[in-house]
Design a protein with these regions (language model features):
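A conserved acidic beta->alpha catalytic loop
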Residues: 46-59, 355-364, 381, 405
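Short aromatic/hydrophobic "clamp" motif used to bind/position activated sugar donors
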Residues: 100, 401
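Conserved donor NDP-sugar-binding/catalytic core segment of glycosyltransferases
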Residues: 107-144, 413-449
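Acidic donor-binding loop at a coil-to-helix junction in glycosyltransferase catalytic cores
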Residues: 178-184, 219, 496-503
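Catalytic core of nucleotide-sugar-dependent glycosyltransferases
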Residues: 204, 214-242, 261-280, 519, ...
């Protein structure tokens, strides 16, 4: 039995059932039984939006088996389809446990995820009302704070709610039958003063899409109606008019599925019938700002359809990964960096912290002794960034290595994403996309900043010629195999700027790297124009020396590699580039060009 450290709150799992696939639903419910075996006190409450157990052959037997195995289970419903939120609202008055886990019938919690979820909720602050679980294989792409885990809204597919908070705001909105009712609930909780968290280390297997980029007609049509309702409740008339304009443009666009225009028109008509209701139930609160991004409600991280593997499909044993942190007299930033590492979904993991000169970081590292395998080293006197990095490399034990300077952050899936991608492509290095966050430092020692703007940069696929010209890979965005360090060595210790660029050029002389189009990290640059200009001037001054050092790099190449480099060079330096292969492909796509090319060949042969 797992030791929950005395933090084992009773919770009720509520599932709205509608014509389930028995095998999938059985796996979902059996995972709850496994959580009870791990020591978690949970109860299951089911609401049938279909006809009940007689609707699905074998379901009654499954319920009996689970009850006999010790799972407290109560099944109700059979009154017709009340919608997802409507079904949960019907169960809400009977909820007596401190926490309620809302779970889709096809969402299967990963082993021990519910135990971790319960521990996190019990240990959290009293003003947190919701803890969202990560969905596998496709994580929802909405952004979240990689330090606090706070998010703007929680998906209803798998979310633990504080029961008192759920009941206080009245549960789900009854006039939103399906889609975006979870956004509305999240925003009402926030307006009532509650905070929401995302817990990526607690996961469910939830196959929401049959293929990447799938268009789901019901979701699209339901979202149009719900979006207009939310604009009415949480924003002004200008946002409502903007939403109606978007809906009309959607009607004029080419149909991606049959009945699309008619479905949107019905959604608009339904919204107009409910406009007065949502206007009368407007919500607002100090500090709450609704976000409408088209039909979405969040800033999104690139990489929505990066496919994660469930635990059962992962490599075993997983390799040890070392995250190497350089720091200097910034304990607040270091603490944030270590929190973002502790949130990593990959295990096993170690952290090597090297402090250059100062000693503030030792106490910070001590705070994480129970959460991380963290080792602290100090250089005294200060010896510079490159020597600090080399000390970290020398101390690392991991098979794979990555850097995280103290003012940068990792999203929780960073190591998992890059390790999986590098393994699938059989390359010794991979790098993800990163936010470039323009910030003003309010209190450096405490790590307090004000962020003004974010962008994804750089965003370039791996290309040696481009890498020889400029750095494609922010230092925290890269994960590499330790064999590269063993072959090429570490940082040039006489470099204090662009030392990472020099390292990447040496690592990739004979090794391929892979760009992974998923955003997994964040680095900060000055928002102040004068400060940014001073920083850029320092980098510019170091650039020529960094380029000169490339003259010392030697590599061998076969004819095929030379040809690829030549093609890359031509493509990189051309304003308009069309190579022979592209021309042949274009000719093949246009029948009249193909016929013209055939006649040209015939005439040419006869002319000879």
């Amino acid at each position: 039995v797992a030791d929950l450290g005395g933090l084992s709150p009773a919770l009720t799992v509520v599932v709205v059932v509608y014509r389930p696939r028995l095998e999938e639903f059985s796996a979902c419910l059996k995972s709850l039984l496994a959580a009870r075996a791990d020591g978690l006190d949970l109860h299951l409450s089911l609401w049938h939006n279909d006809l009940g157990v007689q609707q699905t052959p074998g379901l009654a037997d499954l319920y009996e088996q689970l009850q006999a195995a010790g799972l407290p289970l109560q099944s109700q419903g059979g009154r017709g389809n009340l919608g997802f939120g409507g079904g949960i609202n019907t169960l809400m008055p009977s909820l007596r446990t401190p926490y309620t886990l809302v779970l889709n019938q096809d969402a299967i919690p990963e082993p021990r995820s519910l135990v971790l979820l319960a521990q996190a909720a019990a240990a959290d602050a009293d003003d947190v009302a919701a803890w969202e679980m990560r969905q596998v294989p496709y994580e929802h792409p909405k952004d979240y704070d990689p330090v606090t885990g706070q998010t703007e809204w929680c998906s209803g597919a798998a979310v633990l709610l504080r029961t008192a908070a759920l009941q206080a705001v009245g549960g789900f909105e009854p006039r939103i039958f399906m889609y975006c009712e979870d956004v509305d609930l999240s925003w009402r909780l926030r307006c009532a003063g509650w905070r929401l968290r995302y817990l990526p280390r607690c996961a469910v297997v939830h196959h929401t899409y049959s293929e990447p980029g799938e268009v789901k007609p019901l979701a699209l049509l339901g979202s149009v109606y719900a979006n207009l309702c939310l604009r009415t409740r949480y924003a002004g008339r200008r946002q409502v008019l903007q939403g109606l304009g978007m809906a009309l443009r959607e009607m004029l666009a080419p149909q991606s599925f049959a009945g699309r225009r008619w479905g949107i028109a019905k959604g608009i008509a339904r919204f107009l019938r409910n406009y007065a209701y949502f206007r009368a139930t407007r919500q607002a609160a100090p500090g709450f700002e609704p976000r409408f991004a088209g039909w979405d409600y969040e800033v999104r991280r690139e990489g929505a359809f990066h496919a994660f593997r469930p635990q059962a499909e992962k490599q075993a044993p997983a390799p040890l990964v070392s995250i190497l942190v350089r720091t200097h007299h910034r304990p607040g930033f270091l603490r944030q960096a270590l929190v973002s590492i502790a949130q990593q979904t990959h295990r096993p993991l170690e952290v090597v912290v090297v402090e250059d000169g100062s000693s503030d970081g030792e106490a910070v590292c001590g705070e994480f002794a129970a959460r991380l395998d963290v080792r602290y080293f100090r250089l005294d006197p200060a010896q510079g960034r490159s020597r600090a990095g080399n000390r970290a490399l020398a101390e690392a034990r991991g098979e794979w290595l990555g850097f995280l300077d103290d003012d940068d952050l990792l999203y929780a899936d960073h190591v998992e994403v890059l390790l999986q991608a590098a393994g699938a492509a059989n390359v010794p290095g991979a790098y993800g996309l990163a936010w470039c966050a323009r910030t003003r430092v309010v209190a450096e020692a405490q790590g307090q900043v004000e962020e003004s703007f974010r962008s994804v940069e750089p965003d370039e696929p791996f290309n040696r010629l481009r890498l020889w010209h400029h750095n494609l890979m922010p230092i925290q965005a890269v994960l590499f195999h330790r064999s590269l360090y063993e072959q090429q060595g570490g940082f040039a210790e006489d470099m204090d700027q662009l030392e990472d660029w020099n390292l990447w050029t040496r690592f990739t002389v004979n090794a391929e790297f892979l760009q992974v189009r998923k955003l997994t990290s964040l680095y900060r640059v000055p928002a102040d124009f004068a400060e940014a200009a001073r920083r850029q001037a320092v980098l510019d001054a170091a650039y020529d020396e960094a380029v000169r050092r490339q003259e010392r790099i030697k590599f061998t190449a076969d004819p095929l590699r030379v040809r690829h480099l030549a093609c890359d060079f031509a493509r990189q330096n051309a304003l308009i580039h069309l190579d022979r292969q592209q021309l042949f492909s274009m000719v093949g796509e246009w029948p009249w060009l193909a016929r013209l090319n055939l006649w040209r060949s015939v005439v040419w042969r006869r002319g000879r």
